């Protein structure tokens, strides 16, 4: 079996393998202003040139910097850093490892080296020893622990897929050539291509394209675009008010029945990332 999840979110474990503190979702506002605060020590142009990862306010590097500011005791007590799918794999197998495609989204992995960038980690003031060896998708982690095996009644080998769900989605596209353009749509829409080498030029940085790690050491060169998050949020809010959520076809029909909106909305604006009310 293999597990994939969204990217950027993580857990910290103590020396006994127990979670330290809360696991915080990436839409939390704790990273506000972190990039600007880090700019003197780590200019974003340098950060991008080394990692190839686009600016997003919720990048793992910024989450860890925010944690260092708010709860330095948690970071000091940490022995292990795991992304969300890494942690689930750890619970199943007892093996602590960081899978490459998800690790690449942290903005802590060198685009060329495909390994942890010690200089970036040092400039952020993070403990290097918490980061585990990076494992490539396709490798086997191992069998279930005895505890899991007894609980489920069978054994199973846990394999590493591209544990970033977009990496697995791109891998599933039945493209036959190197010029294919991919669009993976869900809460986010990810539009891009696969490249054999990262593109970390100043022009790429200015356009805020990202180079996420892919299967067989390839790079998913793409743009993050607002996906279904806005309509998902509106649907949830309407359901909370009415007691039952409208269907997506009902929402689309209601929107089509309205008069044209005279303005243009930039759906990529940060105010839509985690508003208290998407409707308002």
Task: State what each model feature region is.
Residues 1-6, 137-138, 185-188:
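Glycine-rich beta-strand-to-loop/alpha-helix junction loops that act as flexible
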Residues 52-55, 104-109, 135-139:
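Conserved short loop/turn motifs at secondary-structure junctions
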């Amino acid at each position: 079996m293999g597990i994939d999840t969204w990217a950027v979110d993580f857990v910290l474990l103590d020396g006994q393998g127990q979670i330290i503190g809360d696991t915080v979702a990436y839409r939390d506002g704790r990273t506000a202003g972190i990039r600007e605060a880090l700019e003197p020590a780590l200019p974003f142009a340098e950060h991008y040139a080394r990692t190839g990862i686009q600016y997003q306010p919720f990048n793992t590097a910024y989450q860890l910097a925010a944690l260092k500011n708010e709860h330095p005791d948690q970071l000091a007590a940490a022995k292990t850093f795991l992304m969300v799918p890494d942690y689930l794999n750890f619970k199943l197998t007892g093996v602590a490892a960081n899978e490459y495609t998800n690790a690449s989204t942290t903005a802590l992995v060198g685009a060329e080296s495909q390994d942890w960038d010690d200089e970036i980690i040092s400039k952020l003031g993070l403990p290097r020893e918490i980061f585990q060896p990076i494992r490539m998708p396709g490798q086997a982690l191992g069998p279930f622990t005895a505890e899991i095996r007894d609980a489920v009644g069978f054994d199973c080998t846990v394999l590493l897929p591209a544990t970033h769900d977009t990496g697995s989605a791109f891998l599933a596209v039945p493209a036959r050539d190197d010029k294919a353009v991919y669009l993976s749509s869900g809460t986010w829409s990810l539009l891009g291509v696969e490249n054999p080498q990262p593109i970390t030029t100043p022009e790429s940085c200015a356009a805020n394209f990202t180079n996420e790690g892919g299967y067989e050491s390839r790079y998913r060169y793409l743009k993050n675009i607002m996906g279904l998050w806005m309509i998902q949020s509106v649907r949830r809010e309407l359901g909370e008010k009415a007691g039952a959520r409208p269907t997506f076809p009902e929402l689309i029909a209601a929107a089509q029945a309205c008069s044209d909106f005279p303005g243009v909305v930039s759906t990529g604006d940060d105010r839509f990332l985690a508003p208290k009310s998407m409707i308002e």
